[in-house]
Amino acid sequence: MPRIESGAYRLGQLLLTKHKEENFANIARGWSLLAEGGTLVCSGSNDDGAASLEKQVGKAFGLDGTLSKFHCRVFWLTRADRAPPDYWRELASLRPVGDGSWLSQPGIFAWDRIDDGSALLATYLPEDLSGHVADFGCGWGYLSREALARSPGIAKIDLLDAEHRAIEAARANITDTRASFQWLDLTQEAAPATYDAIVCNPPFHAGRAAEPGLGQNVIAAAARVLRPGGRFYMVANRGLPYEPLLKANFTSFETLADNNKFRVSRAIR
C-alpha cells in the first residue's frame, strides 16, 4: 500500500513477514507514526521468525507484553524515549544498494541484488523491441532498464507491480521519459493496455510457500494483452509448470536458455 508519510496515532498494528530487514523497516516506520505513549502491536508466525524478532525488538525498545499460541505470537511496545536503531530507520527508505547505481528497500523482490534469473533473461533480450512494451512484475526496474538500454525502438514501457514499494523504487531508478509506472496486481486486475512485447520474471511465492498459480495467472494475463505476433520474454525456475500454459496460450514458444536452475522462454502470441 502507499506509505503514510506522517501521523500521531494512538495505536498501530503490524503484520510481520518472513523477511527480517523488512520487519525492521516496518517497525521503525510504525514507531515513527505513533504519538508519544502510543502502542505498536506486532503479530506473526514463528515459522517466519517472529520468536527471534520478538527478542530483538525487546532489546531495542523493551516490550509491554507478549502472547504465543498456535505457532504464532503477538508482542507490543509503547513509544517512549527509546528510538529504533539507526539501521532499522535506514531500511525504511529507498537507499543505494548493489553497486550504488540503483535504489531499493526491503519488501521488494531481490531488494539488495540483481536476481540471477532476471540477469539471465536480460542477456537474451533482443535489440529490436519496439512499440509499446510492458514489464510484468517489474520489481525495482532492472529488466525495464535493460530493455530500454538495448532497444531504442521502444516507444513506451509500462512497469507494473503489485508491491507499491517496488513501483516507488522503479520510478526512482528509471528516469527515461518512455517509462510509466502503475501499481497493479496482475493476478486480480486487468493490464492497462495492449502490448507489442512483454518481459517478465513472474512471482511464485506467497509468504514462504511456493505458489505456481501466481506465475500462471501472470502468464495468462500477458497472453490476453499481447497483440497478434507480440513477443513474451520470460524467465522462471525450471521446475515450475509453465510450459503447458505457454503451449496453450501462444502460437509458438521456444526455450532460449536452460542452465539447470532457470529457463528463459520466448513465446509468440
Q: Would you name each region that the model predicts?
A:
Residues 68-132:
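SAM-dependent Rossmann-like transferase core, predominantly class I methyltransferases
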Residues 9-15, 195-203, 233:
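Short SAM/SAH-binding signature in class I
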Residues 22-97:
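N-terminal auxiliary segments of SAM/dcSAM-dependent transferases
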Residues 24-36, 215-228:
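A short glycine-rich, Lys/Arg-flanked "PGG" loop and its adjoining helix->strand segment in the class I
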Residues 197-224:
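Mobile active-site "lid"/loop adjacent to the S-adenosyl-L-methionine
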